[in-house]
């Protein structure tokens, strides 16, 4: 897993090359909404895309994480079925639902039943390289979708942003890699603060919300320890009140607040006020800021730090970050149960 994380800049570059060669039959004038259906690591790519194009794409982009699709899916809907393995049962079910509803479908996968079904049914397939854990293939599950939106004319070209992202991540890995000592390594310093604590990751709606979710997922899957996330300003309308009792539990909370230059000004203010309200109640509050000029580079700079933190936590807990045994057991048990 360390190798996969280290190689993310190269993965993004390869994913960009895949994206440049995408050719699909779908036309922008034939669709009025996009639904990206997937789970886990595959869904994160779609959710990142949703946030990235939020103020750029003129049609709705929705992420679906279920066996079925919403009732509004119809012949004017582009359904992107994303499953790294190609065998995710919820995604396969949603694919069949999309087909039944007459939607336009594009699959993004390494193979499996999803590729088999899509090719048999005459739908476009974006094939990405196999051999990784889905969560380690974020570049492959996100960048081709981004390039697809460019090809369809739904957003402006992003070539310069991808180039900067590769450069920023290449620089950051030289700061975060295992050989760099703690005093010069932000990833290691933050990991030590989260170790033997309960990490709570806070993002901001429209900018870092999905990145906070990614941090949570990476900590859970890689370090095999619990983590949670929430989003401003919603958490100011409920969760903030739950910081009075029980004090012995709250004292284990280590908060990470993710900041970006495009955060809504009022949400940035909310973050500062919230920090003052919970200091002294929780174990600590850590402010983490994005790096880079373009939106894409800044997003991935935060993602990359979270990836490294999750791996260093796994090391401290003496857990192998790669296997996800409980997910495998769950899938096997589900496979034994027929409807």
Curated annotation (Swiss-Prot):
Keywords: Carbohydrate metabolism, Isomerase. Belongs to the PGI/PMI family. Residues 22-164 form the SIS domain. Its EC number is 5.3.1.8, 5.3.1.9. D-fructose 6-phosphate binds at residues 41-42, 83, 85, 88, 135, 237, 331. PROSITE patterns: SIS (PS51464). GO terms for molecular function: carbohydrate derivative binding; glucose-6-phosphate isomerase activity; mannose-6-phosphate isomerase activity. Homodimer. It catalyses: alpha-D-glucose 6-phosphate = beta-D-fructose 6-phosphate; D-mannose 6-phosphate = D-fructose 6-phosphate. CDD domains: SIS_PGI_PMI_1, SIS_PGI_PMI_2. The keyword ATP-binding does not apply. One of its GO terms (biological process) is carbohydrate derivative metabolic process. It comes from the Bacteria. It comes from Caldicellulosiruptor bescii (strain ATCC BAA-1888 / DSM 6725 / KCTC 15123 / Z-1320). Dual specificity isomerase that catalyzes the isomerization of both glucose-6-phosphate and mannose-6-phosphate to fructose-6-phosphate. This is Bifunctional phosphoglucose/phosphomannose isomerase. The active site is at residues 221, 237, 331.
